[in-house]
UniProtKB/Swiss-Prot annotation:
The keyword Protease does not apply. This is Small ribosomal subunit protein uS11c. It is found in: Plastid, Chloroplast. Belongs to the universal ribosomal protein uS11 family. Coiled coil: none annotated. One of its GO terms (cellular component) is chloroplast.
Length: 130
C-alpha cells in the first residue's frame, strides 16, 4: 500500500499590517512588549525573561531594550511602519523600550501612559531594611 506523506506547514499566517499598537507593560520585575493590530489581535510579543535575562537582570532597562528590539525587528520584517505606543506600569524599562522601537525603524505616532494610579487604595509594601 502507498502511504501519503503529510506535509507540515506552519500554523502562523503572515499578516501584513502597516500600523499597529505597541503595548509595553513594565513592572518592577519584568518588561513585556506586545504588538497588536488596530483590533487588538496579538501579532508579536516578547519579554525580558524570554530574551534570556533571569532574576534581577529582567528588571533592567537593557533587558527591556532587547525585548523591544526583538519585537520591533519582527514587526518591521512583516511590513509595519507606524505604531502607537501604550505604556503601563512603574518599571525601569519604559523609555528605553520606546527608543529601541524607534531605532528598529518604527515611526511612533502617539505615546499614551495608562499606568493605574490608586486614589489611596491598598497599603503599599513595607520599606526594605538592608
Amino acid at each position: 500500500m502507498i502511504k501519503q506523506v503529510k506535509r507540515f506547514t506552519s500554523k502562523k499566517s503572515k499578516k501584513t499590517v502597516n500600523a499597529g499598537i505597541v503595548h509595553i507593560k513594565s513592572t518592577f520585575n519584568n518588561t513585556i512588549v506586545n504588538i497588536t493590530d488596530k483590533q487588538g489581535n496579538t501579532l508579536f510579543w516578547a519579554s525580558a525573561g524570554g530574551c534570556g535575562f533571569k532574576g534581577a537582570k529582567k528588571s533592567t532597562p537593557f533587558a527591556a531594550q532587547s525585548a523591544a528590539e526583538k519585537v520591533g525587528s519582527m514587526a518591521v520584517e512583516q511590513g509595519m511602519k507606524q505604531a502607537e505606543v501604550i505604556i503601563s506600569g512603574p518599571g525601569n524599562g519604559r523609555e528605553t523600550a520606546i527608543r529601541a522601537l524607534q531605532s528598529c525603524g518604527l515611526e511612533v505616532l502617539l505615546i499614551k501612559d495608562i499606568t493605574p494610579v490608586p486614589h489611596n487604595g491598598c497599603r503599599p509594601p513595607k520599606k526594605r531594611r538592608v
